[in-house]
Amino acid sequence: MIKSKKKFSFICFLFCLQISFSQNTEKKILLIDALNFIEKKHNVSFNYSNDVLENILVDKPKKNLRIELLLEKLFIETNLKFTLLKDGQIIISKKEESEKVTILDEIILNNILTKGISVKKGGKITIRPNEFKILPGLAEPDILQSIQSLPGVLNANKKLSDINIRGGTHDQNLFLWNNIKMYQTGHFFGLISPFNPYLIKEVNLLKNGTSSKYGDGVSSIIEMNNKKSNTKETKVGFGTDLISLDAFLITPMSKKTELQFSARRAYTDVLRTITYNNFFDRIFQDSDLNPNNAQNTSENEKFFFYDISATIYHKFSKKHQLQVNFLNINNNLKYSNTQNTNSFLVPNNLSQNTFAISTDYHFKQNNLKLDAQLFFSKYSQFSTVNNLINGNRNQILNQENLIQENGLKLHGKYQFLDRLDLSFGYQLNETGITNAEDVVSPSFQRFIKEVVLTHSLFYELAYQSVANKFAGKIGFRNNYFEKFDIFNFEPRVSLNYNFLNDFKLEFLGEMKSQVTSQIIDLPQDFLGVENKRWILSNNDNIPILKSKQVSLALRYKKKNFIVTAETYLKRIDGVTSRSQGFQNQFEFSNTNGNQKSSGLELLVHNKFKNVKTWITYNFNNNSIFLEGLNNNSYFPTNQDIRHSLSLNTSVEVNQFNFAIAGNWHTGKPFTSINTTNPLETNSTINFNTVNSNNLKNYFRVDFSMNYTFKFKGRIGLSIWNLLDTKNILNTYYNLDENNFIKTINTNSLGLTPNVSFRINF
């Protein structure tokens, strides 16, 4: 009997213990969620590296505890060090690292615009897509669309394949995916980002003062990186909107190996939604697919896109790690049309494809870090156009732009003094670009292939003073272009000074070069949809692009109120007239020169309880000199948008998020015709002075909302151009078959709704 009672008591004890344990487990939440709660409750911001926080569970913070007690409790639970600074910023570091000084990529402004966007020392703007709450006009996170909300980023044509940063053209930006250069940056030929936001942990925008380890990008760098999640459980996510379906998987394959995989495919070749129809009309309005085209009527158009990415991480030991990356991006358009009232259907197609793969090795021991990467990438754009001549299908034009790039990158970092780091490395790049045309009837073939091999050595010193009052980096990059037997020396500098507790002053400077650029041979190339083609410098009529830039920034932060002001001067030498996209008297000119840009960027951001408001203003003055044109005088570039203003507000209410934004800017330049004498004697259009007129001002309002379910699901609604404002993005003129002048306007995207649904496991 006594034994039975003891057994019963023991069972009760176990049962109570299980209940207690279950209750405690239910109270456990992810550390990153606990930090979000503390930030809202106590008006502080945390500075941390993503890999420090992954998959750590803690007790749910109590509402009535002081911030100091909360941090002490988190220290006990996580064994991480929490350092509270005077400005309300909290530095999180591993305990074993806290005994020595580490020169951090310090966050100086956190959660600007929306959660997940921060400004770091050196002017680097960092975006963590998987922390996004909401941005106006977006139903789902979009990496490159998000960048366009930032100061200094303008887009005259409102396409992701034509992003302008501080007056530069799109090809002057360096897009890196896991350190591999990307030559294709848009789905739907420039309306959707092709990079999955649910695997990319961090996106960095660098406009100036970049590290010497980066080559290319005379205008800016957009860097996208995957990172190991260290998860012990499989994570799966599915999502859809009115354009595509997508899924991702993060799973441990073993204790030392992790797989990250994502895939997305448009269903636009099967189902056409209002979003698809509006996107289609926007992109193809100047092509044969335009239903208003009097000479060509398109039928049977089928368009789709897909992207696939995968990363495998393997940890041999604490010192040695391996990473393998794979990416495939594809856009495909097929359609048939009738020409000149002939009922015969003529097939045409246009495709873009990117393939990239790399192997990365990482070594870390004490104060030394070493990274090595081997990579290969291939980009191709191919089109087939069939033309009817005299009612017969007897002319076919095939065009191709092909890039193959491979190379080696070695990078080391050594901390040889407490507050001094030395970075060093070597990069080898082989870039080959082919441009080919094949015409049937009359027979014509053109095949041009250029290859440039570049060797680069780089080194950099970084210093951080006591109490983080001063931080500075100075670096040098030496490029040797083997084909031209040319050396190019590129200094880089970044200086940061903190004063009066709330103010930060920053000076940045750099020199850069690049051998790739985009040109337009004929407006109707590649169906007139993506008519730019990549080329290589030949050090003759296509010079190596070289840039110089300096900037000065002042930043102020007091609790949740932020003001930043930054001014810059930039010059790029080696620009060509064929890269500018002229549609006037300079359309077929072939000369080169330089471009000058100067400007001011302002950001005002405030958070009050659950409401965020921010204003961005940009002033830009962009002019270009091209030898032999415009009386050898500077004139405004096609990207010369002098003033732009954006007002944004977001509100968080329980599981709901709302965001609305108004975007305004002055009209871009265009070249008008001489109304007194519109035609020259040789039946060509008589233009006025180049880019001496401006389009009407641009205005657009965007709206978004989403709701997060407790079962890790989310539904979202976005409306792009809520007021359906009619904006003209470009105006140019052509002659028809009767030598009458036609005015052609390119219109912006009208009111476009989108709905998304996502669920994660």
Model-predicted segments: where are they?
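Transmembrane beta-barrel wall of Gram-negative outer-membrane proteins
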Residues: I243-Y267, Q285-N332, S351-L370, Y414-F424, ...
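Gram-negative outer-membrane beta-barrel transporters
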Residues: T567-R571, N590-N674
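C-terminal beta-signal and adjacent terminal beta-strands/loops
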Residues: T268, I274, V611, W664-T681, ...
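Periplasmic N-terminal accessory/gating domains of Gram-negative outer-membrane beta-barrel systems
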Residues: F75, V119-G168, N179-S193, E202-T210
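Structural signature of Gram-negative outer-membrane beta-barrels, strongest in the C-terminal barrel
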Residues: Q415-S423, Q427-T431, S441, Q445-R571, ...
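A beta-strand signature from Gram-negative outer-membrane beta-barrel systems
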Residues: L150, P194-K235
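Outer-membrane beta-barrel signature, preferentially recognizing the C-terminal barrel domain
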Residues: N348-D360, N401, E450, D502-K504, ...
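Short, acidic, small-residue-rich periplasmic hinge/interaction motif at the N-terminus
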Residues: L35, E39-H42, L85-I134, H170
